[in-house]
Amino acid sequence: MSTMSTPAAEQRKLVEQLMGRDFSFRHNRYSHQKRDLGLHDPKICKSYLVGECPYDLFQGTKQSLGKCPQMHLTKHKIQYEREVKQGKTFPEFEREYLAILSRFVNECNGQISVALQNLKHTAEERMKIQQVTEELDVLDVRIGLMGQEIDSLIRADEVSMGMLQSVKLQELISKRKEVAKRVRNITENVGQSAQQKLQVCEVCGAYLSRLDTDRRLADHFLGKIHLGYVKMREDYDRLMKNNRTTNASKTATTLPGRRFV
């Protein structure tokens, strides 16, 4: 009989496999060497360079993966961003990051599907809930993005701009409270059983009660796990779009009977 493991442990195992099966050995062997590493060095975390490492996104939460076995140094990220601005591309970094994101997004989507099935809403009820929560979803994404933008501004010592964006963030949060109140007024009439008073967050898969207070809902949507999945889904969609654009360009340039100048 196989031993049981937690979802976080399984995710950590998958991420480490994607980063390279022999990484831990190489990291321990060379960690004592103090030298500047090239960005392609396998000891440097490519997820950290391209976007956000899952180890960082869920640090300190119930889904914590522990500490990333690869290097996270600000100087490497700055170097990567500088070279990207200069026109250099790192498709292999993006592929590695996308592979890791795919694991998380697909697993989360599977959990969401199971959770939705457990609630057993009728098709009509599901459609009605989806319609009334669409505006709420848009606001959640904007709040998450603005929070990340404020963090970036603070790290860049853009304090004035950060304060200005903080005011806008509070306005968005206030607007979300108003929309959430409208949503609850509608969704409380959908289904009569206690089970049907629940809904599933279609970003992170958490169960939410439509009867929750604004504060409890805000705690969820501004929570580290939810915002972590917001970030991963944004980066996943962006990289998938880049892949489709790149593949389309390659196909167009190789079509027979066409001349390109």
UniProtKB/Swiss-Prot annotation:
Role summary: Component of the U1 snRNP particle, which recognizes and binds the 5'-splice site of pre-mRNA. Together with other non-snRNP factors, U1 snRNP forms the spliceosomal commitment complex, that targets pre-mRNA to the splicing pathway.
Other remarks on this protein: Present with 2270 molecules/cell in log phase SD medium.
Molecular function terms from GO: mRNA binding
Subcellular location: Nucleus
Signal peptide: none
Domain of life (superkingdom): Eukaryota
Gene: LUC7
Organism: Saccharomyces cerevisiae (strain ATCC 204508 / S288c)
Listed name of the protein: Protein LUC7
Record PTM N-acetylserine, positions in chain: 2
Family: Belongs to the Luc7 family.
Coiled-coil stretches: 123-190
Any Gene Ontology biological process: mRNA 5'-splice site recognition
Alphabetical UniProt keywords: Acetylation, Coiled coil, mRNA processing, mRNA splicing, Nucleus, Ribonucleoprotein, Spliceosome
Lineage: Eukaryota, Fungi, Dikarya, Ascomycota, Saccharomycotina
Subunit structure: Component of the 18S U1 snRNP particle, a subcomplex of the spliceosome.
GO terms for cellular component: commitment complex; cytosol; nucleus; spliceosomal complex; U1 snRNP; U2-type prespliceosome
Predominant place of localization: nucleus
PANTHER family (alphabetical): RNA-BINDING PROTEIN LUC7-RELATED
Database matches in Pfam families: LUC7
